[in-house]
């Protein structure tokens, strides 16, 4: 999050709080910890992060709101694959929740502002109960497609899935495959027989 965000970060934090309450009811209040990190290092000081938590009425045990220096934030965002860019009214950034296992390794990434509860609770359940599994190829592919095809719509002030990006990719790959097929077929047809 960044604490000067007026809409998306507070809304996302409230949604996450609802899911954390649900997860803790199912898995136990001490079964996992939550850390929210402010990435706007000049402004997201520990005091600003504490104020943001109070403003969001997030006073759950085991949930820390933290700030960091610029170098630590650069390394953390690189390790987590979190992207953000300066924008005229703050930042454009991924909306991302990262599940980290007991060894400090990224276990699962969840993207989006209003994701379904099981997307976060199921990986937590796997880790808490010791039944971890890796994401299937299709789940991983689906997550990557969601990552690159989710766009911000300023008219509605919401993020949405843009099917045209996905459709354009499929058309492009199909066209490329067809051209490759035709080139190979023509090359084989014109090749001299030995």
Question: Where does each model-flagged region fall?
Answer:
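Aromatic-flanked redox-active Cys/Sec active sites in thiol-based oxidoreductases
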Residues: 1-6, 39
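Structural microenvironment flanking redox-active thiols in thiol-disulfide oxidoreductases
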Residues: 11-73
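Sec-exported extracytoplasmic/periplasmic mature domains
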Residues: 21-28, 54-58, 78-82, 105, ...
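Extracytoplasmic/lumenal ectodomains and periplasmic regions of secretory and membrane proteins
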Residues: 86-145
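A residue-level detector for well-ordered beta-strand positions
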Residues: 98, 150-151
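Juxtamembrane/start-of-transmembrane alpha-helix segments at the extracytoplasmic/lumenal side
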Residues: 152-173
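Juxtamembrane interface at the cytosolic side of transmembrane helices
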Residues: 175-194
């Amino acid at each position: 999050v960044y604490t000067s965000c007026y809409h998306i970060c507070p809304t996302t934090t409230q949604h996450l709080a609802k899911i954390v309450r649900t997860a803790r009811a199912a898995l136990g209040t001490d079964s996992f910890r939550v850390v929210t990190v402010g990435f706007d290092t000049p402004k997201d000081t520990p005091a600003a992060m504490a104020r943001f938590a109070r403003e969001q009425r997030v006073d759950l045990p085991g949930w820390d709101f933290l700030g960091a220096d610029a170098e630590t934030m650069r390394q953390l965002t690189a390790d987590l694959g979190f992207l953000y860019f300066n924008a005229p009214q703050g930042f454009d950034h991924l909306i991302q929740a990262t599940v980290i296992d007991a060894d400090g390794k990224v276990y699962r990434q969840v993207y989006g502002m209003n994701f379904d509860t099981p997307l976060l609770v199921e990986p937590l359940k796997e880790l808490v109960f010791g039944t971890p599994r890796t994401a299937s190829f299709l789940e991983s592919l689906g997550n990557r497609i969601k990552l690159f095809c989710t766009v911000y719509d300023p008219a509605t002030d919401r993020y949405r899935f843009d099917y045209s990006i996905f459709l354009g990719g499929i058309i492009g790959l199909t066209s490329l495959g067809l051209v490759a097929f035709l080139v190979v077929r023509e090359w084989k047809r014109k090749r001299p027989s030995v």
